[in-house]
Swiss-Prot record:
Residues 8-54 form the F-box domain. This is Putative F-box/kelch-repeat protein At2g41360. It comes from Arabidopsis thaliana. Keywords: Kelch repeat, Repeat. Kelch repeats lie at residues 116-162, 163-208. The keyword Repeat applies. Transmembrane segments: none annotated. The keyword Ribonucleoprotein does not apply.
Length: 373
């Protein structure tokens, strides 16, 4: 402890630019702990300049996975891409990657830690852990995890304090949690939950994100919050009463953002007792276009992806040709949204928007994660 204090004392003597240069090379998962050391470090970790430095170093990458929505068998196709800026113009594109394709990717809960993507549980083998190294494209199997009392299609998953937390609901106010220690590479069951006779009726989590020691898990019509600092205490997050459908959500600049069907892009004001507030600006022109969407943080901005279906190539040109004889493809669009604090609110400005890929029409968004070196 004394050595840590001494190290910070030496670092505190350096100018902001040099400290930021050091922080830009530190894995993002340590930023939350670093921000607790001092007010100055907390401010530096959240400054836009840090994101600019990380972008110059190409430290962070978005990985998007599409799957065949008409075939969930062992023969399903999984297409992986990464978002990259073009060299000739100030535009972006999704570049195809030769990552492995496995059936567990569809049902598994996913989370990115540094440069690796973890696939936890799912079907057909809910006790498996698979790890994809985004730098090499290699896939390896991790330690077998304990079985949950209830087998679900997916679980809430988040990273906190050097550990991956995997959570499932049991009774109304009771959860079951398993923790994977990233350093020791071992699993631990937290608590001894009591089986729930109505467990089969509990919802499956569609996606989840982590923010300040809490895991926010989205299913079809609600968002649950699991407080990891308080023994995985569960609470329901209130949603707008007339707009409960969340198409996608993510954390950017230590704020939870979600796209709602009616109100568009909202952010969660945790200082005002978890009140949803509208993100102002021209970003609100997008939400009517979001057909099958995904969202992730990209160097302090929001990167939003959505599908736009169109018919591109005719198989034959006979007089009786119809839509069934046409090959369908879909354009994948993306927009980069700059986020700025305006008083007590947040303004979202579209910095760039365009087509980033064309994929087979049978594919849908499956995963959208940010990995970093």
């Amino acid at each position: 402890m004394a050595r840590n204090v001494s190290s910070w004392s030496s670092l505190s003597c350096l100018p902001d630019e040099m400290v930021l240069n050091c922080l830009a090379r530190v894995p993002r998962r340590y930023y939350e702990n670093i921000s607790c050391v001092s007010v100055r470090l907390r401010s530096l970790v959240r400054t836009p300049e840090l994101y600019r430095m990380r972008s110059l170093l190409h430290k962070d990458s978005i990985y998007v996975c599409f799957c065949d929505r008409e075939n969930y068998s062992t023969d399903a196709t999984y297409l992986w891409f990464t978002l990259r800026p073009t060299t000739a113009t100030m535009e972006y594109q999704l570049v195809p990657l030769s990552f492995p394709s496995h059936n567990f990717m569809f049902r598994a809960s996913t989370v990115a830690v540094d440069s690796e993507i973890y696939f936890v549980g799912g079907r057909p083998n809910p006790t498996e852990l698979w790890i994809l190294d985004t730098r090499s494209g290699k896939l390896r199997q991790g330690p077998i995890k304990p079985e949950f009392l209830r087998i679900a299609s997916s679980s809430a998953v988040g990273v906190f304090d050097g550990k991956i937390h995997v959570i499932q609901d049991l009774k109304q106010d009771e959860t079951e949690e398993q923790v994977y220690d990233l350093e020791t590479q071992t699993w631990k069951v937290v608590g001894v939950p009591v089986p729930d006779e109505k467990a089969d009726s509990r919802p499956n989590m569609v996606s989840s994100v982590s923010l300040e020691g809490k895991v926010y898990a989205k299913d079809f019509g609600s968002i649950s919050v699991y407080n990891l600092r308080q023994g995985t205490r569960k609470e329901k997050l209130e949603l707008p009463i007339d707009d409960r459908w969340v198409s996608c959500m993510c954390v950017a600049n230590n704020v939870l953002f979600a796209f709602f069907t009616k109100y568009g892009l909202l952010w969660l004001d945790t200082k005002l007792n978890n009140v949803w507030r509208v993100v102002t600006g021209d970003v609100q022109t997008l939400h009517r276009k979001l057909y099958g969407s995904a969202m992730a943080e990209y160097y302090g901005k929001l990167a939003i992806f959505w599908r736009e279906r169109y018919i591109s190539t005719s198989i034959n040109t006979t007089k009786n040709n119809n839509n069934n004889n046409k090959k369908k493809e879909e354009k994948i669009w993306s927009a980069l949204i700059a986020l700025n604090r305006v008083g007590d609110g947040i303004c979202g400005t579209i910095e760039w928007s365009g087509v980033v890929a064309t994929i087979p029409y049978i594919c849908q968004f499956l995963h959208c994660l940010v990995a970093s070196d």
